[in-house]
Amino acid sequence: VLLKKSALIVASALGLLAAPSAAVTQFAGNGHLYEFVATNLSWQDALAAAAAATPIAGYTAHLVTITSQGEDDFVKALTGSATFVWAAGTDEAIEGVWKWAAGPEAGQTFFLFDEGPVGYANWNAGEPNNVGSEDYLHFKANAGNWNDIFATFTSGGYVVEYSPSGSTIPEPASWAMLMGGLGLVGAALRRRSSRKIVAA
């Protein structure tokens, strides 16, 4: 009985430490799933936490990448009254070259400081301003537009985006299944060619 009570106390304490999150919600515009997690983290910690989110079958978790106005509006509505929320944009590698750091868009440039948008972008007026190592994208959920901010800033939350996985079968298993299937086809063809046809 004492062991059960101790386990219950530990489980309750861990539950209190868990960050509150909204329900996982699907955006009809792209079929992806989204989850807002309200917790104070740096951008790097949010990037890691999103990638480590509880798996959903057929989906891969990552920090949100916002690639359309519809997705932008959906994500902002999902975050409610949160003040600042992390997204996966960064120009840490090359100043002024904003790329997505996660998801299927990882490595894709979406904004060039000297030229403007290459893909979808929704910066506040005068942003990104690249002041003092502001290399990470967050947005003001209540105001709606994007801002660049420094690495040690702790935002009020982040959004996990669950993108459909390319395949639910790991690649090594795919090769094994392909080879096994080809072997079965070969065996069937050999058996078929070795059959004798008897005329009635």
Residue ranges and their predicted role:
Residues 1-3, 200:
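N-terminal secretory signal peptides that target proteins for export/translocation
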Residues 3-4, 134, 170, 189-191:
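Residue-level micro-sites within transmembrane alpha helices that shape
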Residues 4-5, 196:
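A general lysine-centric signal
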Residues 7-8, 74, 199:
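Intrinsically disordered, low-complexity segments enriched in glycine/proline and serine/threonine
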Residues 7-25, 161-184, 188:
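Short, threonine-centered small-residue motifs that mark membrane-proximal processing/anchoring sites
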Residues 11, 27, 92, 103, ...:
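Compositionally biased, low-complexity repeat tracts
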Residues 22-168:
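Extracellular, disulfide-bonded carbohydrate-recognition/adhesion ectodomains
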Residues 187-200:
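C-terminal membrane-anchoring or membrane-association module
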